[in-house]
A protein has these predicted regions:
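A recurrent flexible, glycine/aromatic-enriched loop bordering the glycosyltransferase active site
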Residues: 96-117
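Catalytic beta-strand/loop signature of glycosyltransferases that borders the donor
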Residues: 76, 150-156
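Acidic donor-binding loop at a coil-to-helix junction in glycosyltransferase catalytic cores
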Residues: 132-139
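Glycine-rich, basic loop-to-helix element that forms the pyrophosphate-binding segment
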Residues: 20-38
């Protein structure tokens, strides 16, 4: 990832933050980034093998923060292969998560959706857990206790799947371990 970011080094809007510690999981790396003075008003997820589905994705997220008066925004994504061909089940919108079901409806689903975006001022108060699985789910639950989580049910993100994905073709033992962490 750092090599890809370095290819954009000429663009002053791009900032590469490299943790100096070597004991950090994904959440720990996020935490270093959001505590940097260079981190802006919002922090938005983009996994290294995934893509935003349009040039308007980030603007739509910022608009949702304002229109829905939220501290966190979660979009919807489409499963694709590396040729960007849709894979089953296609669009993952978590349409069962609605305002009428309550803000803690996240407890009833096995994932929050993507991309996930956070208001940085709130995120710095909560902090990312230093783990490499479920760090975003833990934050979603923490945010939902006190803040509104906005939803965008249209596709914003392309989630590319391949055999080496951290959550591809998991054994039942690994699924149970992951679900225990979420519990």
């Amino acid at each position: 990832t750092s090599e890809a970011v370095k290819s954009f080094a000429h663009d002053e809007r791009v900032v590469l933050i490299q943790p100096t510690r070597n004991d950090l999981g994904i959440g720990g790396c996020w935490d270093v980034a959001i505590r940097s003075a260079q981190c802006g008003r919002y922090a938005v997820q983009l996994d290294s093998d995934d893509l935003y589905s349009s040039p308007q994705t980030l603007q739509r997220i910022v608009d949702a923060f304002h229109q829905q008066h939220a501290a966190m925004v979660i979009g919807s994504y489409r499963m694709v292969n590396f040729d960007l061909e849709t894979l089953p089940p296609g669009l993952i919108a978590h349409a069962e998560w609605t305002a009428s079901n309550g803000r803690n409806n996240a407890l009833r689903i096995n994932g929050l959706g993507a991309p996930r975006a956070f208001r940085t001022d709130v995120l710095r108060k909560i902090g990312f857990p230093n783990t490499s699985y479920g760090e975003d789910y833990a934050l979603g639950l923490a945010f939902s206790r006190h803040y509104r989580i906005a939803r965008i049910f249209d596709e914003l993100y392309l989630c590319r799947r391949w055999d080496g994905n951290s959550d591809a073709a998991l054994s039942i033992e690994k699924q149970n371990k992951n679900n225990l962490y979420k519990d």
